[in-house]
């Protein structure tokens, strides 16, 4: 596969590389310690990866409803892990270590809109968030805070027949798009003001501040880019999970394509290029942007009606396929080593049913991504369609980031990479590929 990576270097044109991407922001989900078996990750297993990472983002803290204070989501775990993580600076003195808040880990069914409530809060309530953040960061030796606020998301693409597509286009002439947040403009201004106040407080305390744009959070709704970017040390674009089996149960497609594929009524903003260009065209310096890559894949369940070819868009899917046995964190989610073990070159061809290998289909254009599939059997069972970025395609995205003059790559996250070397014997293959092709 390496020859394809050199091919993409030519495709993107080395002459367009304005400046080498240097950042490798590595996210670490602390709950990986609570997993079972081979997915359980200890802090000492981070060492090999951290020789490549420039930043480590520890996830995740939460926002306490009511008081709007920053707080630990798992006190029993974090009271030990905070110190263990920040102590890594002794081995890696150049490493910047930040604490992330939100990140879709702050599940609060009673207060699902509490991050919007923080934006709408008065200055006194917002000061609770700022003060509690500074105390927690300073007490535990973090270099700064990463804002991965769980703001309202774009509505998922709906499946329409030809008549439905025509009617939707006709209806939009009169009604426009569905409004997710009618106060988005107000919230954009409030977010800008809040970030400015956080930055002013952090500046005197010598603390960093970064932003993570979570998947499907609409940047046009909440982020006033020209006013915001000076307040952040860097901005991480989680440019993946554009489609998932939970958001899009009836059709499977590339979850993180680099470019727009103008076919089958795809939406033009569901790709890396659109997201990156939005920030660049709104005057955010490229060196402040880090392109987010997922080290996991998303799997749909195929039906007999889904067909045999697997060429996306795949219709008549039935939601999420079973998730990884080791991770057990979400339906349809598999870590890279779990994906690797299921591919036909690594799994026995003699297996049948749910253990039968998946056939990998490589994107020779290197624009959209790779996928793997196992068609449903004669009873409509065991069908799987899986979209993922393997180490090679992660390297291609690193080259893309260089071609756009971006600051680097943000990897979500280390615990989903092959940190044990189960696939090929090499540990952290995705991290290594990204670092190699960033130069």
Curated annotation (Swiss-Prot):
PROSITE patterns: GH18_2. Residues 1-20 form the signal peptide. The keyword Disulfide bond applies. Glycosylated. One of its GO terms (biological process) is carbohydrate metabolic process. Pfam families: Glyco_hydro_18. Disulfide bonds join 26-53, 340-423. Glycans are attached at residues 122, 218, 346. GO terms for molecular function: chitin binding; chitinase activity; imaginal disc growth factor receptor binding. It is found in: Secreted. Residues 22-439 form the GH18 domain. Keywords: Developmental protein, Disulfide bond, Glycoprotein, Secreted, Signal. GO terms for cellular component: extracellular region. Coiled coil: none annotated. The keyword Signal applies. PANTHER family: CHITINASE, CHITINASE-LIKE PROTEIN IDGF1-RELATED. Cooperates with insulin-like peptides to stimulate the proliferation, polarization and motility of imaginal disk cells. May act by stabilizing the binding of insulin-like peptides to its receptor through a simultaneous interaction with both molecules to form a multiprotein signaling complex. Lacks the typical Glu active site in position 150 that is replaced by a Gln residue, preventing the hydrolase activity. Its precise function remains unclear. Belongs to the glycosyl hydrolase 18 family. IDGF subfamily. This is Chitinase-like protein Idgf1. It comes from Drosophila simulans. The lineage of its organism: Eukaryota, Metazoa, Ecdysozoa, Arthropoda, Hexapoda. The gene is Idgf1.
């Amino acid at each position: 596969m390496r020859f394809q990576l050199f091919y993409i270097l030519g495709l993107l044109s080395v002459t367009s590389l304005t400046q080498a991407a240097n950042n490798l922001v590595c996210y670490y989900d602390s709950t990986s310690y609570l997993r079972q078996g081979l997915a359980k990750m200890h802090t000492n297993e981070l060492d090999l990866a951290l020789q490549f990472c420039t930043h480590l983002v520890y996830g995740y803290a939460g926002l306490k409803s009511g008081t709007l204070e920053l707080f630990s989501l798992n006190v029993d775990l974090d009271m030990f892990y905070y110190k263990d993580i920040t102590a890594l600076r002794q081995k890696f003195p150049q490493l910047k270590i930040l604490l992330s808040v939100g990140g879709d880990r702050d599940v609060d069914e009673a207060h699902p809109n509490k991050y919007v409530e923080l934006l709408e809060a008065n200055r006194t309530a917002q000061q609770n968030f700022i003060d509690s953040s500074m105390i927690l960061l300073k007490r535990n030796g973090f270099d700064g805070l990463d804002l991965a606020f769980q703001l309202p998301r774009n509505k998922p693409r709906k499946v329409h027949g030809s008549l439905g597509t025509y009617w939707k286009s006709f209806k939009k002439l009169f009604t426009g798009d569905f409004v997710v947040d009618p106060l988005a403009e107000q919230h954009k201004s409030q977010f800008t003001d809040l970030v400015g106040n956080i930055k002013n407080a952090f500046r005197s305390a010598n603390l960093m501040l970064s932003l993570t744009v979570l998947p499907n959070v609409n940047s046009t709704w909440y982020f006033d880019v020209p006013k915001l970017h000076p307040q952040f040390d860097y901005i991480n674009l989680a440019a993946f999970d554009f489609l998932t089996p939970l958001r899009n149960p009836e059709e499977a497609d590339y979850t993180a394509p680099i470019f727009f594929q103008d076919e089958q009524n795809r939406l033009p903003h569901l790709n890396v290029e659109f997201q990156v260009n939005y920030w660049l065209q709104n005057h955010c310096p490229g060196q402040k942007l880090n392109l987010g890559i997922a080290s996991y894949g998303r799997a749909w369940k195929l039906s007999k009606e889904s067909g045999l070819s697997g060429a996306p868009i795949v219709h008549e899917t039935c939601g999420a396929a079973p998730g990884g046995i080791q991770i057990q964190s979400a339906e349809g989610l598999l870590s890279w080593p779990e994906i690797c073990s299921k591919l036909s070159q690594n799994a026995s061809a003699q297996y049948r049913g749910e253990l039968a290998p998946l056939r990998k289909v490589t994107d020779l254009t290197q624009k959209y991504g790779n996928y793997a599939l196992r068609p449903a059997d004669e009873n409509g069972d065991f069908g799987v369609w899986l979209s993922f970025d393997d180490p090679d395609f992660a390297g291609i995205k690193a080259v893309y980031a260089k071609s756009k003059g971006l600051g680097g790559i943000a990897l979500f996250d280390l615990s989903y990479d092959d940190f044990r070397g189960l696939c090929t014997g090499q540990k952290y293959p995705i991290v290594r590929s990204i670092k190699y092709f960033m130069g």
